[in-house]
A protein has these predicted regions:
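Intrinsically disordered, low-complexity and often Lys/Arg-enriched segments
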Residues: 1-6, 29-32, 55
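TOPRIM-like Mg2+-dependent DNA-processing core and adjacent phosphate-binding/basic surface
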Residues: 71-89
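Long, charge-rich intrinsically disordered scaffolds of nucleic-acid metabolism proteins
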Residues: 87, 91-144
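Short active-site oxyanion
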Residues: 7-9, 59-62
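Short glycine-rich, Thr/Ser-proximal phosphate-binding strand/loop in the N-terminal lobe
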Residues: 14-42
């Protein structure tokens, strides 16, 4: 059994109106877009990805997203639903210097998924830096 079996990976590109979800199992990729902040729709898409990849409903999910204006409530929501999440420092993400860099939510989500897979499946250590998620009270004090 390989390391990636029985795991689903999800990268999220969060924007004001929509969230781009990019799922993978180490072999295939599936992208979906949902309205921002819709927890039930997010969980429905996670279930559909597991089904599409032929995995059990209780298959663990590992996810990531870039730290940004949404703060850390998304991380807490994912954790509350049994999803293991890391919040990535956007400044730590490698950017191709030579090639012209196209920026779309679809491409960004796919790149984030690739980084998550490199770290989780192939053990690459310096793929990205993880942000320490503050508690709710600490986050509220930071916003003042």
């Amino acid at each position: 059994m390989s390391q990636q079996e029985n795991k689903v990976f999800m990268a999220m590109e969060l924007s004001k109106n929509n969230w781009k979800l990019c799922f993978g199992d180490g072999k295939r990729e599936r992208q979906r877009t949902i309205p921002a902040g819709q927890e039930k729709l997010l969980l429905d898409e996670v279930a559909k990805a597991k089904e599409k990849f032929g995995l059990d409903p209780d298959t663990p999910v590992f996810s990531c997203y870039e730290a940004g204006r949404d703060g850390f409530w998304v991380d807490r929501m994912l954790s509350r639903n049994g999803i293991v999440n890391v919040v990535i420092d956007p400044a730590s993400i490698e950017v191709p210097r030579r090639a012209r860099h196209r920026k779309t939510d679809r491409l960004d989500a796919s790149r984030l998924l690739n980084l998550l897979l490199r770290a989780a499946l192939w053990g690459e250590r310096k793929v990205f830096a993880v942000v320490v998620v503050p508690g709710e009270g600490q986050e509220a004090r930071m916003r003042i």
